[in-house]
A protein has these predicted regions:
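Cell wall/extracellular polymer interaction/catalysis modules
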Residues: 1-125, 129-136, 140
Length: 140
């Protein structure tokens, strides 16, 4: 299970921490207004028409893989959240509110882990939790 702890909501973005099996993997940023509601989701690798490769798409509750389109939320590389649409989440190393670096590197690493799980036919769960910076463990 992947958990994203949202720590800070600012006008520059929603800053979070992505954790797998209790270990911090990377930071996340989302658009300050167009982000997914906190809750449980699944992740599936899907070919999207406007992308050159399969992307880790975030499936909403009850959504089937064949219902995914170009406007589906996904995990992706990037630098800042202002161009994000549809609830997409950028991965990377946080340097300021709404800004990450080394995004492609963190994205590729996470995708490799997710692909291995997918090949084993494991269901990839995503839980998004809204926590303030005072609530999240110092370890993250």
């Amino acid at each position: 299970e992947i958990i994203i702890y949202r720590r800070r909501f600012t006008r520059w973005g929603v800053d979070g921490t992505l954790v797998i099996k209790g270990t911090k993997v990377c930071n996340t940023i989302e658009h300050p207004e167009r982000y997914l509601p906190a809750g449980d989701y699944e992740i599936a690798f899907v070919s999207i028409a406007n992308k050159s490769r399969k992307m880790p798409v975030i499936l909403r509750k009850g959504q089937a893989v064949w219902e995914v389109g170009i406007n589906s939320p996904c995990l992706k590389p990037g630098n800042g959240p202002m161009t994000l649409k549809y609830g997409c989440i950028i991965l990377g190393k946080a340097v300021a509110s709404g800004l990450v670096i080394h995004s492609q590197e963190y994205f590729d690493r996470l995708c490799e882990r997710l692909r291995k799980a997918s090949k084993k036919m494991e269901c990839i769960k995503l839980r998004i939790i809204d926590w303030g910076s005072d609530d999240i463990s110092i370890a993250f």
